């Protein structure tokens, strides 16, 4: 990976070395500096949680578990919430990521993952296959809005797996043979912490077995500066091939 070229006060040489070796980095709020008031972030997320099924705007995705219809994710939200747009695509996150990777980048996916009580987990997988037709390489920031614990289904990583090219089976999961002997490490986070990782990290999630939400804000960034409009193309494609609950009344004018 390219050495860092844009120093950030919260990212040390040891952090860069850890990220390169392990494929992820945890930073507390006082180190990353993406926002100065956790309570404000939580208010922003509370506002978005009340958004309805308006059409042609943000995208709400739901899951059904144990007979309950639960909000799972809200995507394409930046246009409709200025503070969240700055948090995800402003100078601060881009400077932080450049200090870690040495690369400039552009956001192409923005969302909140809600992980409500009873929310489902996810089998071991990589994020790369889901987005590779748009961005073969990318990096993600996950900002913990609530505490992330083993009990409420925090992310679990296999450190260093980004270097191993984990094989993917026909159903999109990591091949079972590769998983033998691998240890998944829980990414326990305090509210306000960030977790940064790349497209090739092997990870899984357990269900949320508590009575508390485990929300996080996500920004996903690609490195091809010649495609500043990739986000528009991505969401036009996603509207057709992975439509949200409020998609049936959206007007789709883009080509797949």
From Swiss-Prot:
EC numbers: 1.14.11.-
Keywords from the named record: Alkaloid metabolism, Dioxygenase, Iron, Metal-binding, Oxidoreductase
Annotated positions binding Fe cation: 125, 127, 203
Listed cofactors: Fe cation
Pfam family membership, one: PhyH
Gene3D superfamilies: q2cbj1_9rhob like domain
Expression triggers: Expression is induced in loline alkaloid-producing cultures as well as in planta.
GO BP terms, alphabetized: alkaloid metabolic process
GO molecular function: dioxygenase activity; metal ion binding
SUPFAM superfamilies (UniProt xref): Clavaminate synthase-like
Superkingdom to which the source organism belongs: Eukaryota
Pathway: Alkaloid biosynthesis
Industrial and biotechnological uses noted in the record: Loline alkaloids show broad-spectrum anti-insect activity, and different lolines may have different biological activities. In vitro tests of NFL, NAL, NML, and semisynthetic loline derivatives with long carbon-chain acylations on the 1-amine have shown that many are effective against both fall armyworm larvae and European corn borer larvae, but the effects seem to differ depending on the modifications. N-Formylloline reduces the weight gain of fall armyworms by deterring feeding, and does not significantly affect corn borers.
Assembly, per entry: Homodimer.
PANTHER family, alphabetized: ECTOINE DIOXYGENASE (PTHR20883:SF48), PHYTANOYL-COA DIOXYGENASE DOMAIN CONTAINING 1 (PTHR20883)
Record family assignment: Belongs to the PhyH family.
Function in brief: Dioxygenase; part of the gene cluster that mediates the biosynthesis of loline alkaloids, potent insecticidal agents composed of a pyrrolizidine ring system and an uncommon ether bridge linking carbons 2 and 7. Lolines are structurally differentiated by the various modifications of the L-amino group and include norloline, loline, N-methylloline, N-acetylloline, N-acetylnorloline, and N-formylloline.
Protein name: Dioxygenase lolE2
Name of the gene: lolE2
């Amino acid at each position: 990976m390219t050495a860092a070229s844009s120093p950030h006060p919260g990212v040390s040489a040891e952090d860069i070395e850890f990220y390169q070796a392990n494929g992820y980095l945890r930073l507390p709020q006082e180190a990353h500096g993406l926002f100065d008031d956790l309570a404000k972030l939580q208010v922003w997320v509370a506002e978005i949680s009340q958004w309805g099924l308006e059409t042609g705007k943000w995208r709400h995705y739901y899951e059904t578990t144990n007979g309950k219809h639960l909000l799972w994710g809200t995507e394409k939200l930046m246009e409709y919430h200025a503070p969240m747009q700055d948090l995800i695509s402003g100078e601060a996150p881009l400077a932080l990521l450049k200090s870690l990777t040495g690369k400039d980048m552009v956001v192409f996916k923005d969302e909140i993952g809600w992980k409500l009580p009873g929310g489902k987990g996810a089998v071991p997988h990589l994020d790369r296959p889901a987005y590779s037709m748009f961005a073969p390489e990318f990096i993600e920031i996950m900002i913990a809005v609530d505490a992330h614990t083993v009990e409420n289904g925090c992310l679990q990583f296999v450190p260093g797996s980004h270097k191993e090219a984990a094989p993917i089976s026909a159903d999109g999961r990591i091949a079972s043979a590769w998983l033998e002997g691998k240890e998944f490490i829980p990414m326990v986070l305090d509210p306000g912490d960030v977790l940064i990782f790349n497209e090739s990290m092997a990870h899984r999630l357990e269900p949320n077995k508590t009575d508390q939400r485990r929300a996080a804000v996500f920004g996903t960034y690609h490195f091809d500066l010649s495609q500043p409009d990739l986000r528009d193309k991505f969401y036009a494609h996603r509207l057709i091939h992975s439509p949200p609950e409020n998609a049936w009344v959206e007007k789709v004018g883009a080509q797949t």
